[in-house]
A protein has these predicted regions:
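Short loop/turn segments that connect beta-strands within beta-propeller blades
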Residues: 18-21, 56-59, 105-109, 144
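Extracytoplasmic beta-rich repeat domains
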Residues: 1-2, 9, 20-40, 64-87, ...
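Conserved beta-propeller blade signature
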Residues: 4-7, 43-45, 53, 91-94, ...
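Hydrophilic extracytoplasmic domains
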Residues: 96, 103-144
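Generic detector of contiguous secondary-structure segments
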Residues: 38-58
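Surface-exposed loop/turn positions within WD40 beta-propeller blades
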Residues: 2, 11, 49, 98, ...
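Loop/turn-rich, solvent-exposed surfaces of beta-rich toroidal or solenoidal domains
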Residues: 46, 53, 61, 66-67, ...
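WD40 beta-propeller blade core
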Residues: 15, 53, 102, 141-142
Length: 144
């Protein structure tokens, strides 16, 4: 946002750091290895365990936590990791290490769809001109 940077240090800590002074604005206990997305006053990130965190950017207050892996059996969840996510049309699109994409409603956190789109070699999703793209098996695939 020009004033702060937001990141996880992969040690269950998610930070907001003041760009000018380098001081910590706030810290939360979130284990995430993927890049967060900032929209207006909200920060979105997905933990290694598949939880979508929605936080207020200035104070770091957690507004909502949604379990995006809830439809997987415990045995599968244990080895499942998020690859990355994109946000568009009020939905969150999350790709996973098993080749699935999960579509979640951004307002409620509910899961709208889960679909197998490839094997375990898929990229995080990208949105361009209102279309969703994923790199899958070395090819760029467009979804409507």
């Amino acid at each position: 946002d020009g004033n702060s940077i937001y990141f996880s240090n992969n040690k269950n800590e998610f930070y907001s750091i003041d760009v000018k002074t380098g001081t910590t604005n706030w810290r939360n206990e979130i284990n995430s290895t993927i890049t967060p997305i900032l929209i207006k006053n909200l920060i979105f990130t997905v933990s290694e365990e598949g939880y979508l965190y929605v936080m207020e950017k200035n104070e770091g207050n957690v507004i909502r936590i949604s379990n995006l892996f809830m439809n997987y059996k415990k045995k599968i969840r244990k080895n499942l990791k998020p690859i990355g996510f994109a946000i568009g049309n009020l939905n969150l699109y999350l790709t996973n290490s098993n080749g699935d994409i999960i579509v979640s409603d951004l307002n409620s956190g509910s899961i709208l769809n889960k679909k197998k789109i490839g094997n375990n070699l898929i990229s995080r999703p990208f949105i361009y001109n209102n279309s969703l793209f994923v790199v899958r098996n070395g090819s760029i695939v467009k979804y409507n």
